[in-house]
Protein backbone atom coordinates (compact mmCIF):
# COMPACT_ATOMS: atom_id res chain seq x y z
CA UNK A 1 0.00 0.00 0.00
CA UNK A 2 1.04 3.56 -0.51
CA UNK A 3 2.43 3.06 -4.03
CA UNK A 4 1.70 6.15 -6.10
CA UNK A 5 2.06 7.53 -9.62
CA UNK A 6 1.23 10.67 -11.57
CA UNK A 7 0.11 11.19 -15.16
CA UNK A 8 -0.03 14.66 -16.75
CA UNK A 9 -1.83 15.82 -19.87
CA UNK A 10 -2.64 19.12 -21.58
CA UNK A 11 -6.33 19.47 -22.50
CA UNK A 12 -6.70 20.89 -26.01
CA UNK A 13 -9.65 21.82 -28.17
CA UNK A 14 -8.72 18.96 -30.52
CA UNK A 15 -8.94 16.45 -27.64
CA UNK A 16 -12.33 17.82 -26.57
CA UNK A 17 -13.60 17.59 -30.16
CA UNK A 18 -12.27 14.03 -30.52
CA UNK A 19 -13.89 13.02 -27.21
CA UNK A 20 -17.20 14.50 -28.40
CA UNK A 21 -16.96 12.58 -31.66
CA UNK A 22 -16.11 9.29 -29.95
CA UNK A 23 -18.56 9.60 -27.04
CA UNK A 24 -21.46 11.19 -28.90
CA UNK A 25 -21.65 13.96 -26.27
CA UNK A 26 -22.06 17.07 -28.41
CA UNK A 27 -23.20 19.38 -25.61
CA UNK A 28 -22.56 22.95 -26.85
CA UNK A 29 -20.99 23.74 -23.48
CA UNK A 30 -17.98 21.78 -24.73
CA UNK A 31 -17.99 22.70 -28.42
CA UNK A 32 -19.64 26.08 -29.07
CA UNK A 33 -17.73 29.11 -27.74
CA UNK A 34 -20.70 31.44 -28.37
CA UNK A 35 -23.04 29.23 -26.35
CA UNK A 36 -20.46 28.59 -23.63
CA UNK A 37 -19.96 32.36 -23.23
CA UNK A 38 -23.59 32.59 -22.02
CA UNK A 39 -23.04 30.04 -19.23
CA UNK A 40 -21.60 30.61 -15.75
CA UNK A 41 -18.29 29.20 -17.05
CA UNK A 42 -17.95 31.92 -19.69
CA UNK A 43 -16.10 29.63 -22.08
CA UNK A 44 -16.00 26.04 -23.27
CA UNK A 45 -15.12 23.39 -20.72
CA UNK A 46 -13.93 19.82 -21.19
CA UNK A 47 -16.26 16.88 -20.69
CA UNK A 48 -16.14 15.53 -17.16
CA UNK A 49 -15.59 12.03 -18.47
CA UNK A 50 -12.59 13.20 -20.50
CA UNK A 51 -11.06 13.93 -17.11
CA UNK A 52 -12.19 10.47 -15.99
CA UNK A 53 -10.55 8.94 -19.05
CA UNK A 54 -7.20 10.31 -17.88
CA UNK A 55 -7.61 8.26 -14.69
CA UNK A 56 -8.21 5.20 -16.87
CA UNK A 57 -5.03 5.97 -18.83
CA UNK A 58 -2.97 6.26 -15.65
CA UNK A 59 -4.34 2.93 -14.40
CA UNK A 60 -3.81 1.13 -17.71
CA UNK A 61 -0.36 2.46 -18.42
CA UNK A 62 1.20 3.13 -15.01
CA UNK A 63 -0.43 1.82 -11.81
CA UNK A 64 -0.94 -1.07 -11.80
CA UNK A 65 -0.19 -0.84 -15.55
CA UNK A 66 -0.74 -3.01 -18.63
CA UNK A 67 -3.03 -5.97 -17.99
CA UNK A 68 -5.10 -4.09 -15.39
CA UNK A 69 -8.86 -4.54 -15.40
CA UNK A 70 -10.97 -1.59 -14.24
CA UNK A 71 -13.67 -2.91 -11.87
CA UNK A 72 -15.36 0.27 -10.61
CA UNK A 73 -14.90 4.00 -10.18
CA UNK A 74 -16.48 6.62 -7.96
CA UNK A 75 -15.87 10.14 -9.18
CA UNK A 76 -16.77 13.64 -8.03
CA UNK A 77 -16.18 16.61 -10.31
CA UNK A 78 -14.96 19.49 -8.14
CA UNK A 79 -14.20 22.26 -10.66
CA UNK A 80 -14.44 22.84 -14.42
CA UNK A 81 -11.60 21.95 -16.76
CA UNK A 82 -10.92 24.62 -19.36
CA UNK A 83 -9.19 24.26 -22.72
CA UNK A 84 -5.49 24.78 -22.15
CA UNK A 85 -5.53 23.37 -18.61
CA UNK A 86 -2.79 20.91 -17.73
CA UNK A 87 -4.20 18.11 -15.60
CA UNK A 88 -2.22 15.85 -13.31
CA UNK A 89 -3.75 12.57 -12.17
CA UNK A 90 -2.37 11.16 -8.93
CA UNK A 91 -3.15 7.54 -8.08
CA UNK A 92 -2.35 6.11 -4.66
CA UNK A 93 -2.92 2.53 -3.50
CA UNK A 94 -5.05 2.73 -0.35
CA UNK A 95 -6.19 -0.89 0.02
CA UNK A 96 -5.29 -4.39 -1.18
CA UNK A 97 -7.76 -7.28 -1.16
CA UNK A 98 -6.58 -10.12 1.06
CA UNK A 99 -7.34 -13.00 -1.34
CA UNK A 100 -7.65 -11.51 -4.82
CA UNK A 101 -5.31 -9.32 -6.85
CA UNK A 102 -7.62 -6.34 -6.37
CA UNK A 103 -6.50 -2.93 -5.23
CA UNK A 104 -8.30 0.28 -4.36
CA UNK A 105 -6.79 3.49 -5.67
CA UNK A 106 -7.39 7.00 -4.43
CA UNK A 107 -7.71 9.14 -7.56
CA UNK A 108 -7.04 12.88 -7.52
CA UNK A 109 -6.97 15.17 -10.57
CA UNK A 110 -5.59 18.69 -10.25
CA UNK A 111 -5.09 21.50 -12.74
CA UNK A 112 -1.89 23.45 -13.27
CA UNK A 113 -2.74 25.69 -10.29
CA UNK A 114 -3.03 22.71 -7.93
CA UNK A 115 -6.82 23.04 -7.79
CA UNK A 116 -8.70 19.74 -7.48
CA UNK A 117 -10.95 19.20 -10.49
CA UNK A 118 -11.96 15.59 -9.76
CA UNK A 119 -11.48 12.98 -7.08
CA UNK A 120 -12.68 9.50 -6.29
CA UNK A 121 -11.71 5.88 -5.83
CA UNK A 122 -11.13 3.10 -8.33
CA UNK A 123 -11.17 -0.65 -7.81
CA UNK A 124 -8.80 -2.47 -10.13
CA UNK A 125 -7.84 -6.08 -10.75
CA UNK A 126 -4.07 -5.89 -10.96
CA UNK A 127 -2.17 -8.24 -13.25
CA UNK A 128 -0.71 -11.17 -11.34
CA UNK A 129 2.49 -11.11 -13.39
CA UNK A 130 4.54 -8.14 -14.49
CA UNK A 131 3.48 -7.29 -18.04
CA UNK A 132 6.12 -6.09 -20.47
CA UNK A 133 4.41 -4.64 -23.49
CA UNK A 134 5.31 -2.58 -26.49
CA UNK A 135 3.01 0.40 -26.56
CA UNK A 136 1.64 0.87 -30.04
CA UNK A 137 0.77 4.51 -30.74
CA UNK A 138 -2.87 5.01 -31.66
CA UNK A 139 -3.67 5.98 -35.24
CA UNK A 140 -3.75 9.68 -36.02
CA UNK A 141 -7.23 11.14 -35.84
CA UNK A 142 -8.46 13.68 -38.33
CA UNK A 143 -11.67 15.44 -37.43
CA UNK A 144 -13.80 16.43 -40.39
CA UNK A 145 -16.47 19.10 -40.00
CA UNK A 146 -19.95 17.62 -40.32
CA UNK A 147 -20.85 20.32 -42.85
CA UNK A 148 -18.06 19.18 -45.18
CA UNK A 149 -19.35 15.62 -45.02
CA UNK A 150 -22.78 16.66 -46.29
CA UNK A 151 -21.18 18.62 -49.15
CA UNK A 152 -19.67 15.39 -50.49
CA UNK A 153 -23.06 13.66 -50.77
Annotated model-derived regions:
Residues 1, 81-153:
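HotDog/MaoC-like acyl-thioester-processing domains
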Residues 1-46, 153:
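Catalytic strand-loop segment that frames the active site of acyl-thioester-processing enzymes
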Residues 6-11, 76, 123-125:
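Generic structural detector for well-ordered beta-strands
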Residues 21-24, 60-64, 112:
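Short, intrinsically disordered, mixed-charge
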Residues 28, 64, 80, 126-127:
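Proline-rich low-complexity regions
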Residues 37-46, 50-93:
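Hydrophobic beta-strand-centered segment that forms part of the acyl-chain substrate-binding groove
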Amino acid sequence: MGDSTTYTRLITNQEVEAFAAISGDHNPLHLDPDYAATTPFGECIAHGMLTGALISAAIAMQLPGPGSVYLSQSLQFKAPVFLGDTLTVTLTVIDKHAKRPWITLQCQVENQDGKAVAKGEAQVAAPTTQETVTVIPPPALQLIEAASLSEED
